[in-house]
Amino acid sequence: MARGKANDGDGNWKKFIWNSEKKELLGRTGGSWFKILLFYVIFYGCLAGIFIGTIQVMLLTVSEFEPKYQDRVAPPGLTQVPQVQKTEISFTVNDPKSYDPYVKNLEGFLNKYSAGEQTDNIVFQDCGDIPTDYKERGPYNDAQGQKKVCKFKREWLENCSGLQDNTFGYKDGKPCILVKLNRIIGFKPKAPENESLPSDLAGKYNPYLIPVHCVAKRDEDADKIGMVEYYGMGGYPGFALQYYPYYGRLLQPQYLQPLVAVQFTNLTYDVEVRVECKEYGQNIQYSDKDRFQGRFDIKFDIKSS
């Protein structure tokens, strides 16, 4: 009796999967399956069409050349090269392997600043050797083609150019870092007022320059930094205004950010030294929540052996 019930159960589910009498698969005939599949193809096709149409309409309102809304964009951050984890540079003076990653990072970044990479006069423009005013190059949504960019001579970085010393001072315990301002389309940094500058910078004021200055992050490190040398355009320790505004990757794909090289020539060995570098300008802001907004700090740990 039990075996008969089991056989009936087996027959029921087999019949549900394929009913040979009614020619039904899973309770539906071939015509029914065709109709329901056709319905879902049309249904999801319409959904996809609505989605694609919405995206296309949205893209019509978005410029490919510049962001539509920039009123909430924070001023660009200040960063350094070499790019290091935990913003720490640690090496041993007489061990080339310990500072080789920093040297390679610097050399790789500076390759595009070499004279041989800036020979195309259709793209690159000589904007002078001293800071001057902004270089306006027309509208930001210009579809006429690429806009020119200012050349930046690697030689301006002097001891930190890697041309005379291919270790950028690291083999002598005098490390160099490169300071740069991140790119934001249309941003025009405004030079600071002279009276707002630290005393070390007041005598080097230039109305067309965003100066950069590095000091001890902690009071106890003030006597461990030693002399700091700055190298930039025309010997000025800052970013010249003629490199701004930036027009974006489509219009200025070979844009070169102005650089300031900072060399620490007499850091104390075998102790950790924290340094803070800041840029100064009327529209430069600082934030405790973002340690790279207008400034950054970096730790040096140079071992004598």
From Swiss-Prot:
Domain of life (superkingdom): Eukaryota
Keyword Membrane in annotation: yes
Glycosylation sites: N159, N194, N266
Keyword tags: Cell membrane, Disulfide bond, Glycoprotein, Ion transport, Membrane, Potassium, Potassium transport, Signal-anchor, Sodium, Sodium transport, Sodium/potassium transport, Transmembrane, Transmembrane helix, Transport
Positions in coiled-coil regions: none
GO MF term set: ATPase activator activity
Primary location: membrane
Swiss-Prot/TrEMBL GO biological process terms: intracellular potassium ion homeostasis; intracellular sodium ion homeostasis; potassium ion import across plasma membrane; sodium ion export across plasma membrane
InterPro entries: Na/K_ATPase_sub_beta, Na/K_ATPase_sub_beta_sf
Subcellular locations according to the entry: Cell membrane
Keyword presence, Nucleotide-binding: no
PROSITE patterns for the chain: ATPASE_NA_K_BETA_1 (PS00390), ATPASE_NA_K_BETA_2 (PS00391)
Topological domains annotated Extracellular: 64-305
Cytoplasmic topological domain: 1-35
A GO cellular component entry from the record: sodium:potassium-exchanging ATPase complex
Disulfide bonds: C127-C150, C160-C176, C214-C277
Membrane topology term: Single-pass type II membrane protein
Transmembrane regions listed in the UniProt entry: 36-63
One Pfam family it belongs to: Na_K-ATPase
Family the UniProt entry places it in: Belongs to the X(+)/potassium ATPases subunit beta family.
Binding partners and assembly: The sodium/potassium-transporting ATPase is composed of a catalytic alpha subunit, an auxiliary non-catalytic beta subunit and an additional regulatory subunit.
Known function: This is the non-catalytic component of the active enzyme, which catalyzes the hydrolysis of ATP coupled with the exchange of Na(+) and K(+) ions across the plasma membrane. The beta subunit regulates, through assembly of alpha/beta heterodimers, the number of sodium pumps transported to the plasma membrane.
The protein, known as: Sodium/potassium-transporting ATPase subunit beta-1
Native species: Gallus gallus
